[in-house]
Regions:
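C-terminal regulatory/effector modules of DNA-binding transcriptional regulators
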Residues: 65-141
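Short, positionally conserved secondary-structure boundary motifs
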Residues: 1-61, 66, 94, 101-102, ...
């Protein structure tokens, strides 16, 4: 999921951010932009361009990120080891995971003991952004 900085700034208003689709917290899913708009509390935004994704799956449950939650992502192409990132794998599939980067390997680590880490050559993984906030609805639909 990659929007230009101009597109993100144009779509963000005082309270809202672009809601650009879903992110896998499980098996990676195809990265598709489906842009809507979502009101986001000021405390969940940063000074840099941000966007919102809805979580699909249970690979991050031990980090308190559940299926159906909305995550606020700061768009950037770098992250520190241990941060939760939106990772684009092979320029096609996106997932939300902890990241550990080494010279010859990038490891995407779930927060669910039943799911194994995914290991890739660094050229296969592109960081699309870093988690900076989260929202949840307790309404059953």
């Amino acid at each position: 999921v990659r929007l230009t900085q101009q597109a993100l700034m144009a779509m963000a208003d005082e309270d809202g951010l672009p809601l650009v689709g879903a992110i896998a917290a499980g098996q990676p899913i195809e990265a598709i932009e489906n842009i809507n708009h979502m009101v986001v509390p000021e405390q969940l935004k940063t000074d840099n361009p941000c966007y919102v994704l809805q979580v699909k799956g249970d690979s991050m449950i031990d980090a308190g990120i559940f299926d159906g939650d909305w995550v606020v992502i700061e768009q950037r192409s770098h992250a520190r080891n241990g941060e939760i990132v939106v990772a684009l794998i092979d320029k096609n599939n996106a997932t939300l995971k902890y990241i550990e980067q080494y010279p010859h390997e990038t490891v995407l680590i779930p927060a669910n003991k039943t799911i194994k880490p995914m290991r890739f050559h660094p050229n296969q993984v592109e960081i699309q952004g870093v988690l900076v906030g989260q929202m949840r609805s307790y309404q059953h639909r």
